[in-house]
A protein has these predicted regions:
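C-terminal structured domains
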Residues: 242-328
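Long, hydrophobic alpha/beta structural blocks
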Residues: 1-279
Length: 328
């Protein structure tokens, strides 16, 4: 990751104070660069981020075009973004003390603008002093990572591809991503994590409905998603349906329709997505509270793992070619 520009503004709507940075952050300083890289990397790879699209009349998009075309500087654009966000948060009665980090980076040849609005916490630092004994000073602390309450956006400057990380909140009787809709003037699609949950729920429901083996169907879906994320390729819902429901062809269109009705696009981007550990394994629950956790790829390799159904309807599980066994 190459950090081109970075500025930090204070948006204290609780105390009605806006402090815009007068100088950029010292990105060449080793500790500052390391802190920024950790935080910006987490923003790029957040599993809960949602793909968004700007409305045609978006004021933010208009200013963004001016910045990309170099008619305004990073400092000026950064200050405008801070002032605009402060005004929107005040208008929505979002009274909180936050730091708004704005950075332009180059990652894998792509130039991105990243904004992270994050609540900061107060802390006390002790400085030993020979004359005054121990002196306590109040400081503010920003965490290294991205928190659930943060508002984050990532914009690829070449084509204005937008990703947003924001928890929904109630506004005028509706659950919405408030700052994305008001500040960016953009709409958002479900996140990769939400998409995965929807597809797994629909897949499980339809497997049970058509008397298919759920133990085989869900791991297949998880494996396809895992491979797509590792390759950073799109997930086509129709292709997933084709693989899952080979035995029940008429279920393919129903699966695609149910997923579409849940608000999921026909093709799902996996750009910058990272898999949680739980998405790399499959848990099997059996009688007598037996739980088996296996790597996903094992379920498609009969030489390593097999489920055998007996004539009386019971199952046997074989884990094969094990060279080492430990109690954990």
């Amino acid at each position: 990751m190459q950090i081109e520009h970075s500025m930090l503004h204070l948006l204290n709507t609780a105390s009605q104070t806006l402090v815009c940075a007068q100088a950029p952050l010292p990105i060449k300083e080793e500790k500052t660069a390391a802190f920024l890289e950790r935080k910006l990397s987490k923003a790029l790879g957040a599993r809960k981020r949602k793909q968004g699209s700007f409305q045609e009349n978006s004021l933010f998009l208009e200013r963004l075009r001016q910045y990309r075309d170099k008619t305004i500087s990073f400092d000026a654009f950064s200050t405008w973004m801070a002032e605009h966000l402060y005004a929107e948060k005040s208008e929505c009665a979002r009274y909180e003390d936050s730091a708004f980090l704005i950075s332009e980076i180059v990652e894998e040849g792509r130039r991105n603008l990243i904004g992270i609005d994050q609540n900061y916490q107060s802390a006390m630092t002790c400085y030993p002093d020979q004359e005054q004994n121990n002196v306590l000073y109040e400081t503010t602390v920003l965490p290294n990572g991205i928190l659930k309450t943060d508002f984050v956006f990532v914009i690829e400057l070449s084509d204005f591809t937008l990703y947003v990380l924001e928890e929904k909140s109630e506004w005028q009787g509706k659950e919405t991503t408030l700052l994305a809709s008001r500040y960016l003037q953009a709409t958002t699609a479900p996140s990769f994590e939400e998409t995965q949950k929807v597809m797994e729920t629909v897949g499980k429901t339809m497997s049970e409905k058509y008397d298919m083996d759920v133990v085989k169907v869900l791991p297949k879906m998880k494996q396809m998603m895992k491979e797509a994320v590792e390759a950073q390729s799109e997930i086509a819902v129709a292709e997933v349906a084709e693989v899952l429901f080979q035995e029940v062809p008429y279920a393919k269109d129903l699966f695609v329709e149910e997923v579409k009705n849940a608000g999921i696009a026909a093709k799902v981007s996996t750009a910058h997505c990272r898999l949680a550990k739980s998405n790399k394994v499959q848990k099997l629950l059996a009688d007598a509270e037996i739980e088996i956790t296996l790597p996903l790829e094992y379920l498609s390799q009969p030489a390593k793992f097999e489920i055998i159904e007996a004539a009386d309807g019971t199952y046997s599980i074989q884990i094969k070619n094990i060279t080492n066994l430990k109690s954990k």
